Amino acid sequence: MIKEYMKNILCDIIFKGDNMPEINLELEVCGGCNEKIGIKDLSSLLKDLNPYKRKEITVGFDGKDDACVYKINEDISLVESLDFFSTMVKNPYDFGRIASTNAISDIYAMGGEPKFALNIVCFPEGENLEILKEILRGAEDICREAEVSISGGHSIHDRKIKFGQCVTGLVKNNEIWTNKGAEVGDYFILTKPLGVSLVMSAYSVGETSEENYIEAIKNMTTLNKYAAEILKKYKLSSVTDVTGFGLIGHLDECTEESVEIFADEINFLPGSYEAASDFLFTAGGERNRKALEDKVEFTFNDFALEEVLFDPQTSGGLLFAAKKDQAEKILDEMKESGIPAFYVGRVISRENKKFKVI
């Protein structure tokens, strides 16, 4: 009853930003990476497909990685990804910034340098075009910061506003990162706090502050460029970014071993833990829970913490694994640079449950 009630409230809302065009958030399950098709459904679909694969493709969708990699020569590869979704914020300019930051992140997560992007636009016929202009302006500003050239795109009429980008970059063949390979003894670190969807849910029904909402926007519009620049100095076992499948969902892709998650180390966005305590969770978070909860042992009762760990992130941080000595140096350097990185946990030998929250 509570879940259905919240879903109905959250998914038919109109927000107005200060001096900005109106965005209509008529969403089935809310916007951003919260809209992703569930882990189980997507895995079931992809396992039955067998697409043609060129020999130059060294990383494809079969690895559930952040982007595909196409080997150009012995030195360098092309890395490419696309992301798009519906609105989840009240300000069109912010929406463009978030969508672009999120799309570019996949290139950083592979160790690459983004070079150019193509816009993906879905926009209702007859809607105020000033809204679209502001979305595109937001994307332009993020791409300018990332030194990414917007070089074209495609637009169609649609019932709902959607925006994203196809981003292309380059990566040296000996510097490609993947989301696999974390080993026993490695430590996981995440570069951004968790709880974005929870804050958005709470804000949409007036249950969290404007300050918390603004902090969530800041989190989603911070490029992973700066964290990636630091990481390139170190030896890493596994790298990905945390988005729609939540922290546990993306951890699940990084190792075949088990992971102890350090509950006391988890960094929450302001207002997210309180939102979870008030049952203001999202449809995407509940999909993640259903797909993954059988793999998780919680050694103490903390429902709100559970929801944060399953919460879908839009434009989340880089999640990486490294040996302890490397992890300590990376964490120190990131903190000195103002990056709010924190320990997530450590890889241990495989146990009955893949994840243990301690």
Language-model-detected regions and their locations in the chain:
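Active-site glycine-rich loop that binds ribose-phosphate moieties when present
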Residues: 166-175, 211-231
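Glycine-/charge-enriched secondary-structure boundary and capping motifs
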Residues: 9-30, 41, 125-149, 158-161, ...
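Short, compositionally biased
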Residues: 200-216, 337-340
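A generic local secondary-structure boundary/capping motif
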Residues: 57-59, 67-70, 106-108, 140, ...
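Short, well-ordered amphipathic alpha-helical segments that serve as non-catalytic structural scaffolds
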Residues: 97-107, 138-142, 146, 223-227
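N-terminal glycine-rich phosphate/pyrophosphate-binding loops that anchor nucleotide-derived ligands
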Residues: 15-109, 148, 183-188, 193, ...
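Glycine-rich anion-binding loops of enzyme active sites
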Residues: 72-88, 113-208, 346
